[in-house]
A protein has these predicted regions:
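Cys/His-rich short segments
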Residues: 3-72
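DNA strand-break repair and replication-stress modules
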Residues: 105-253
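Catalytic cores of large soluble enzymes that bind and process phosphate-bearing ligands
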Residues: 19-20, 48, 52, 70-71, ...
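Generic structural "secondary-structure junction" signal
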Residues: 9-13, 24, 37, 54, ...
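Generic beta-strand/beta-sheet core signal
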Residues: 1, 8-10, 38, 47-49, ...
Length: 253
């Protein structure tokens, strides 16, 4: 059960007069773009989009995270180091990394470099629903990505679908449709997808199962797994229409 704290009031008597009124910054911490409040959203966002250096870094971190492709060894610190040494600039650059590049980095040893290359190569075999989630399209998390793949069968067909096609799917909101349509209009996003497909990512779901007993259900995998690893179970669940999250919530089945 989620515990949501309630603010019942302020402790005015604790104030000594040194407090200052807080004002929302008008400029992104990157220093290049203004901060905008999107209509109907309470979260401020940088107007620079993917041109914002901070947003770009965070998108790469999310892409490689457990919620994304779960590239073992591709931590936030590793990504920051790769960016600092200009080894990557976009998410697709991850799949052009070579052992020879990594071994030259400070404090990188043979095993660390080899393991990361192996993890990167393994992530290319991720199912299309996981790749779709990793792209970080607003409002498209694991559950929605699975739902889209189940109904269309491939990432390319999802991108080709119009609003009317998407509206027919139970569970796909207007916010998802609008976000997906906006994302498709950015040429850089489509170039990224093309590059990922060239690197070997499978965009088409094989043996898509819509009416599976796992379809639409959310799972959390914990504990020690024998005779298999966590990623194998994730792939099995996702191929059968389910989704996997990292923590238990009210949506967990």
């Amino acid at each position: 059960m989620d515990v949501i704290p309630e603010v019942v009031g302020s402790l005015d008597k604790k104030r000594d007069g040194s407090q200052n009124k807080w004002n929302m910054p008008s400029t992104c911490p990157c220093g290049e773009f203004k901060i905008n409040f999107i209509q109907d959203e309470k979260v401020p966002r940088c107007s620079g989009g993917t041109s914002c250096k901070i947003a770009k870094k965070e998108s790469i971190i999310f892409f490689a995270s457990r919620t994304g492709l779960e590239i073992d060894g591709m931590s936030k610190e590793t990504i920051e180091s790769l960016l600092t040494f200009d080894l990557i600039k976009e998410v697709e650059d991850i799949f052009s990394l070579k052992y020879e590049d990594l071994i030259k980095l400070p404090q990188w040893e043979d095993k660390k470099a080899s393991n990361l290359i192996t993890s990167i190569e393994k992530s290319i075999k991720s199912p299309p629903s996981r790749l779709l989630t990793a792209l970080g399209i607003r409002f498209i998390g694991k559950r929605t990505a699975n739902l889209l793949i189940q109904n269309f069968g491939s990432i390319n067909k999802i991108l080709d679908a119009n609003s009317e096609d998407l509206e027919k799917i139970h569970g796909i909101s207007v916010s998802v449709i609008n976000s997906l349509n906006e994302w498709k209009l950015v040429e850089k996003n489509l170039l990224t997808l093309n590059t990922l497909q060239e690197k070997g990512f499978n965009f088409e779901e094989i043996n898509t199962v819509i009416d599976s007993e796992l379809s639409g259900k959310t799972f959390v995998i914990t504990g020690t797994l024998q005779n298999s690893n966590r990623q194998d179970f994730i792939n099995l669940i996702e191929k059968n229409g389910g989704s996997v999250t990292t923590s238990i919530s009210k949506n967990t089945d």
